[in-house]
From Swiss-Prot:
Native source organism of the sequence: Comamonas testosteroni (Pseudomonas testosteroni)
Domain of life according to the entry: Bacteria
Name of this protein: Toluene-4-sulfonate monooxygenase system reductase subunit TsaB1
Name of the gene encoding the protein in the UniProt record: tsaB1
Keywords assigned by UniProt, alphabetized: 2Fe-2S, Aromatic hydrocarbons catabolism, Electron transport, Flavoprotein, FMN, Iron, Iron-sulfur, Metal-binding, Monooxygenase, NAD, Oxidoreductase, Plasmid, Transport
Alphabetical list of PANTHER family matching this protein: CARNITINE MONOOXYGENASE REDUCTASE SUBUNIT, NADH OXIDOREDUCTASE HCR
Annotated EC: 1.5.1.-
Annotated positions binding [2Fe-2S] cluster: 266, 271, 274, 304
Length: 317
């Protein structure tokens, strides 16, 4: 979905320390387009920002009465979470500008482990509901810095019972030991969402697992050190345009600077919306969308984060 949908904030409630849950309903009272578990929406805020939030209640319905999202407080954010926590009120008019699914569940996976860290529980909670509805054998490990920060705790307990395993870092003396817990592959797949250290640990702990059995959603893409960024020439073949991408800007920034309106959503390398075909150039892939095989082909890139390792990049745009 790419057309704007006007929504109204119907309810706001706290679901954990520093986590607010929002209930969004169509401004005209109509049903909202449905979505599969793992989907997110782009929410346009009155302060001009557009932010992505996972749909907590998306389980594959054709239509939905409301969209439910949760927003964690982040003092270092670019303004989205702070505005919602400090300014948002019931009755506020907002716009949903896009809906997409980055981590759709595979139907062939019948024994599933869900792994959530912090606010990463939002898409994972939706997946847990979908698994329960579809009769999938599911287990969920949820972790947070402290127990009061575990969002949707009561709902998860009611849904999963003994299949829910909780981990509070402050009570356990540190993060969950995934290397020890995942030494043996007992599931068809793991779906995970959480902070980078948790997902990096998951990647290392499951390196011996079957390819494609670990799927994760990150909060943001990888960052290339400033010292490694070099300017390069960007050629947009079909548009007949060329420009220099400076060290401090992205390919997407440069495209917009020369007047090319290209679709994007996250600007973090995690959603796949800004995928572009590559005709020439050595791509430095910094996204979390493409597989290692797709990266090696050097045929496409996410222009919001990935760069060129040589002096010239030619895109089929």
């Amino acid at each position: 979905m790419s057309a704007d949908v006007p929504v109204t904030v119907a309810a706001v409630r706290a679901v954990a320390r520093d986590v607010l849950a929002l209930e969004l309903r169509h401004a005209n009272g109509q049903p909202l387009p449905g979505a599969s578990a793992g989907a997110h929406i782009d929410l346009a805020l009155p302060n001009g920002l557009v932010r992505q939030y996972s749909l907590v209640n998306a389980t594959g319905q054709a239509t939905m009465d409301c969209y439910q999202v949760a927003v964690g407080w982040d003092a270092n954010s670019r303004g989205g979470s702070v505005w919602i926590h400090e300014k948002l009120k019931v009755g506020q008019a907002l716009r949903v500008t896009h809906r997409a699914t980055c981590s759709e569940m595979a139907p062939e996976h019948r024994r599933v482990l869900l792994l959530a860290g912090g606010i990463g529980v939002t898409p994972i909670y939706a997946m847990a509901q979908a698994c329960a509805q579809q009769g999938v054998d599911v287990e969920l490990w949820a972790s947070a810095r402290s127990a009061p920060r575990l969002a949707y705790l009561e709902e998860l307990k009611a849904l999963l019972g003994q299949r829910l395993h909780l981990h509070a870092d402050d009570e356990q003396g540190g993060p969950m030991n995934l290397t020890e817990r995942l030494a043996t592959q007992r599931w068809d797949a793991v779906y995970a969402c959480g902070p980078a250290p948790m997902l990096d640990a998951l990647t290392a702990a499951t390196a011996h697992w079957a390819p494609g059995s670990v799927r994760m959603e990150r909060f943001k893409g990888a960052e290339q050190p400033a010292s490694e960024r070099q300017p390069f020439e960007l050629v947009l073949q079909r548009a007949g345009l060329s420009t220099t991408v400076d060290a401090h800007e992205s390919v997407l920034d440069a495209m917009e600077r020369v007047g090319v309106d290209f679709p994007w959503s996250c600007r973090e390398g995690i959603c796949g919306t800004c995928e572009a075909p590559v005709l020439e150039g050595e791509v430095q892939h910094l996204d979390y969308v493409l597989s290692p095989e797709e990266r090696a082909e050097q045929r496409r890139m996410m222009v919001c984060v990935s760069r060129c390792g040589g002096g010239r990049l030619v895109l089929d745009i």
